Amino acid sequence: MTPPPATGKPSSSLLDRVSSPADIRDFSIEELEQLTYEVRQEMIQSVSFTGGHLGAGLGVAELTVALHHIFDTPRDRLIWDVGHQAYPHKILTGRRGRMRTMRQGGGLSGFTRRSESEYDPFGAGHSSTSISAALGMAVARDLKGATNNVIAVIGDGAMSAGQAYEAMNNAGAAGSRLIVILNDNDMSIAPPVGALSAHLSRLLSSPSYHSLRHLVKDLAHLLPPSLERAVGRAEEYARGMVSGGGTLFEELGFYYVGPIDGHNFEHLLPVLKNLRDSDDTKPVMLHVVTKKGRGYPPAEAAADKYHGVGRFDVLTGQLEKPKANAPSYTSVFAKALIAEAEVDDRVVAITAAMPGGTGLDKFGDRFPARTFDVGIAEQHAVTFAGGLATEGFKPFCAIYSSFLQRAYDQVQHDVVLQKLPVRFAIDRAGLVGADGATHAGSYDMAFLGCLPDIVIMCPSDEADLMHAVATAVSIDDRPSAFRYPRGEGVGIELSERGSVMPIGKGRVVREGNRVAILSLGTRLAEALKAADELAARGLAPTVVDARFMKPLDEELILRLAREHEVLITVEEGSVGGFGSHVLHLLASKGALDNGLKVRPLALPDVFVEHDAPAIQYEKIGLNASGIVATVLATLGEARSVVSA
């Protein structure tokens, strides 16, 4: 069925009848096709209003409908890897009425979330976790003597991460029934699919084939060893002829079925039904081929298939692009790195499947031979960068803060312990807005700051970011890192190339008295606003841009402690970061013994919910008014007042 173009308000005659997946279990194929069309229209309309991940969900609309039609969710556990593609799933599982709140303050998450619905048995946001979680659920089911199915849906991109293969290796040996659906939406694995492949996949997944296969194997045991091996080789050869491409999965212990057309219900439904009803204990890999952005021509025509988009016009697909007041930090990083690479051919760049998100697509356009996209493989990316560093290159490993967490052992063991001069460009530092807690860059200062002999820079604006890049290039005797947030800078004038900063030295932005505000990172603008407000009240604080989280500018910090009554530290990181290191310094030097009042302002010890970044920071007191309130409370009370 070819859906009409996505224009106007979607007709929802069938979707209006669906409040849960149970309502679609008796639908005919024709009704399922119509329902899929309506789900796509609902999704397009919702994402045009909220922004979000559109292309992946459009690509799995038929698969989502088919899964909820065949399987008894939520009793049967359905786990979506990453969660980018789960919007149709949300629409069908009782959340349709809240789709326009998605990624908004107080609204639905942009990913699956256990606290949001019983149909989300496992939360996500990062990739390649679904098979591990599904196997855990399958083993738990067996231990409890239950009979429900467990299904994991994972994309071909997520299959580039090692955890997926670790999980498959374990699953192949565990002996628990598990269904893994490989959603191949880039044609990167599968050959063209068609009726023959669908017919053979239906055959391979059928109970009769399974029974015949077991019978042949049982009879083969009665034959002499040489003939038994020949029968096994013949069976493997025959399966390879009909399945085409499943050898790796078979070697890992999976029963491979596919590839089949993920947009054709006549192909999907019988195979899924066979897998649902199978009593085989071997895990199964079902390979489906889909088209990202399916059903919305602007998405199908776009290079990124509308993977992640802001608000857009439904009729034209034109994205709303508010006029930027300044370039984004990501684009400034790319500009700075290109400028350094122009004069130093040892500068190379590494990304873990995020060239566009990190700005390395621009670097790659200019220096393709010096740009390495290693896939969703942060652990490998870090150690690969370490290897480059041993040979005299200057690797910049550009990874989102929340994704760098996945490679912590490699950072510590492979890079920092060996003092290899890898440069970590940590994008999306601090709170990130609509993507919420799964993507927030809250912890990098805490988990990097405890490592010996690493330089950690936190630029306060886009010009400082260019200086951080230049400084990182100059550091050849140890690893370094610099962190910067999502979004645009403050609009400061930029030079063509950054300048090298003195290591571990901050700068006094404004001299004052009584109160010192020691800011690290891009909260400096809010610190200066707070200083203006306090000055209007007759109190002129000193404002300092720390610049370095490690090493600290001990001389400057101790001077601030001697000359002020109150010291406020401000950072876009969790407890255990900059403020904690400053307090440790002050305590160890006896600087707290004479009554100095220190108040660390950091991210609170909770996961901050998704919302607009400005609102997120306002709620936790990390804006100008929060700083002012903390200063006034501290001056007005003898006892400790800590803002959270």
From Swiss-Prot:
Describe the function of this protein.
Catalyzes the acyloin condensation reaction between C atoms 2 and 3 of pyruvate and glyceraldehyde 3-phosphate to yield 1-deoxy-D-xylulose-5-phosphate (DXP).
Q: What is this protein called?
A: 1-deoxy-D-xylulose-5-phosphate synthase
Q: Which UniProt keywords apply?
A: Isoprene biosynthesis, Magnesium, Metal-binding, Thiamine biosynthesis, Thiamine pyrophosphate, Transferase
**Biological pathway:** Metabolic intermediate biosynthesis; 1-deoxy-D-xylulose 5-phosphate biosynthesis; 1-deoxy-D-xylulose 5-phosphate from D-glyceraldehyde 3-phosphate and pyruvate: step 1/1
Concerning Pfam families, the annotation shows: DXP_synthase_N, Transket_pyr, Transketolase_C
The protein's superkingdom reads Bacteria
Where do the coiled-coil regions begin and end?
none
Which reaction is recorded as catalysed by this protein?
A: D-glyceraldehyde 3-phosphate + pyruvate + H(+) = 1-deoxy-D-xylulose 5-phosphate + CO2
What does the record note about the cofactor?
Binds 1 Mg(2+) ion per subunit. Binds 1 thiamine pyrophosphate per subunit.
Q: How does it assemble?
A: Homodimer.
The entry sums up its family as follows: Belongs to the transketolase family. DXPS subfamily.
Encoding gene per record: dxs
